[in-house]
Each structure stands twice: as C-alpha cells, then as structure tokens.
Amino acid sequence: MTTNTVSRKVAWLRVVTLAVAAFIFNTTEFVPVGLLSDIAQSFHMQTAQVGIMLTIYAWVVALMSLPFMLMTSQVERRKLLICLFVVFIASHVLSFLSWSFTVLVISRIGVAFAHAIFWSITASLAIRMAPAGKRAQALSLIATGTALAMVLGLPLGRIVGQYFGWRMTFFAIGIGALITLLCLIKLLPLLPSEHSGSLKSLPLLFRRPALMSIYLLTVVVVTAHYTAYSYIEPFVQNIAGFSANFATALLLLLGGAGIIGSVIFGKLGNQYASALVSTAIALLLVCLALLLPAANSEIHLGVLSIFWGIAMMIIGLGMQVKVLALAPDATDVAMALFSGIFNIGIGAGALVGNQVSLHWSMSMIGYVGAVPAFAALIWSIIIFRRWPVTLEEQTQ
C-alpha cells in the first residue's frame, strides 16, 4: 500500500505521527539544557562540567549520522523506524536508572545513535507519505513538531524535572516514545528505501558549491547559537539572578517565538529565503551581543528571547529547505550530512560555552557567541551574492 492508494486522512495521520516523533527526538536532545543545574546537584558536580554531556551527544550524532545512514540504506524504513525507537526507549530507561554521571552519558549516547538515523530519513519519509501536492505542508508539519519541542517539550521537561526530579523527565520521554512507536506500527505501510544515496553520492554532493556553502554556514551559525543557549538556564539563575520559574518561562517564550518564525518563513520563504536567512542571522547576532546587558531586567530578557527564537527557527528552516532542494537525488545522504554538521555546531557551541563558563565567566557566553554569529552573517552575504539565483534552483 502506498500513499497514492490511501485516503488523505490516513496519509496526514502518518505525517502527523512522524511530526510527533520529531517532537520527541528534539525534546530529548534539548531538554538537558533546562536540567543542567538539577543533574549537577544530583551528581555533586559543577553545572559547566555536566554541560559536556551536550557536546558528547551532539558529536556522536555528527560522527554517526552518515555511517549509520549508509549502513541502513537498504533497510525497509518501517522496520528501521521500529528498531531505532526500541533503542531510543531502552536508552531512556537507562537514563532514568542511571546511578552515575558516566552511566547517564552512556544512555545519552544510545539516544544519539537513534537520533543519528532518525533525522537522516525523516524529511524524505514525510515527503513520500504526504497527500498529493502537499509535500511542503508535510515538511512544515515536521518543522512544527521541531518547534513545539522548544515551545512545550523543553519547558515541560524542565517543569517535570523541577517538581519530580530530572530522572522522571527522561522516563516520561520514554513513555511518549513508546506510545508513538505503537502508532507507527499501526499506521505505517512497508516503506522500501528510495533515493537514499550511497557513498557514490558523496563526491557528487561535494561538487555542489552552493550546498557546501550552506553546510559551512550551518555549522558556524549553530555554533554561535549554542555557545549561549546551552547555558541559558544557569545564566538566568546565576548571572541574571532570576528565579528557576523565570528560567522556565524564558525557555517557553524562546521556544514559542519559534512558531512565529515558522509562520514568517512559511509566508515569505519561497520568494525571499536568502534575505530571510541573512536577516535572521543579523538578528541572532544582535541578541547574543545584548544578552548580558539585557540580564538586568526580566522584561528585556523576555523581549530578547522572542527575537532570538524567531531568528533561530527561520535559520533552521532555511537551511533544511535549501539542502533538500539542492540534493533531490540523494536526500537521505544530504540530510544525514546536514544532521551531522548541525550537531557539530551544537557540540562546538556547547563546548565553547563550557570552556568560557569554566575558565572565564558564564556572563561572557553571549559576547563569545556573537563572534561566530558575525562570521556567519558575512558568509551568508557572500554566498547569496555569489549565487544570486535562489539556491533552491541551484542543482549543481
């Protein structure tokens, strides 16, 4: 059975289930950002020391995305999704039971393995299962699941951690994943691998300068963002001096603003993608540079978080759309590379934030993050001038 022979309702249910899966995967990647202080207290460690967990997770995803994608390139996609969800759930049970920080890190590596495969195949699967003529909306739905992870997943995870302990946050994510797995088993048809690409795809992709430029832009701008974002929770409490509840509200506000960014990109992205991305990077630069000055006021931090969230959603959507359009003949390989590169940026940013916090001052994370943000802005202007035709139309 294919999406051409099923009702639109069933087709949309399949896409929605994938969007829920995207929500869960993004929630578990980002939720430690809101739990660093609690985890540190539990294991009698410094918050900055616990933050290295973010870098390890991200770099495992970066390192394994392409190898795992190639290893599973011929595996039927429904079976592959079921297997990776089993690994995902088991790893969260281990997170819940972890009796030391080392065990917690090992459990997170298991989650990262599942993550590495999931994000290399999800976008192309959403396109395949979408109703006829609704591919863009299907991708938008996946993006919405991603955004909601920031809007609801991360703050809810933090709230659960505050009141029931950080272990319950990971356990709850595992339960959500189990329910999603049951839905996937019921709804998804057999999905033979299509257009997954192979090692032969790599030289072809590497010969596409527009695509390589987008990859480079991605890693630099993501590094900038995560230098500050990885430590926003302890920054709000320890540097700004505000309450844990305000830190939760700020994460909710920043994530919610991502929905606004998604709407803006949905309206203007087809015509003005390049201009939107450059503008969003400039906005990110301003937000990072003003992070410490804004720390003297809850209102100032709140307003800054809104613009920060809008900027990052536009940047993330812009990068993903361009990668998919520039590699239609090898979507899984291109997205595996994108996922890996994105996570290199996450890991690098978290590591820079970690080192700044340990050896300088956590108050400086915004200023330090602004440096690669400025470089990303200059690079975006250069590449969008170098390819004046919209990058979506560049196929080689």
From Swiss-Prot:
Homology family: Belongs to the major facilitator superfamily. SotB (TC 2.A.1.2) family.
Gene: sotB
Subcellular location: Cell inner membrane
HAMAP family, per the entry: MFS_SotB
Role description: Involved in the efflux of sugars. The physiological role may be the reduction of the intracellular concentration of toxic sugars or sugar metabolites. Transports L-arabinose and to a lesser extent IPTG. Seems to contribute to the control of the arabinose regulon.
Protein name: Sugar efflux transporter
One Pfam family hit: MFS_1
Topology in the lipid bilayer: Multi-pass membrane protein
Segments in the Cytoplasmic topological domain: 1-14, 71-80, 124-135, 191-208, 267-274, 320-332, 385-396
Stored SUPFAM superfamilies: MFS general substrate transporter
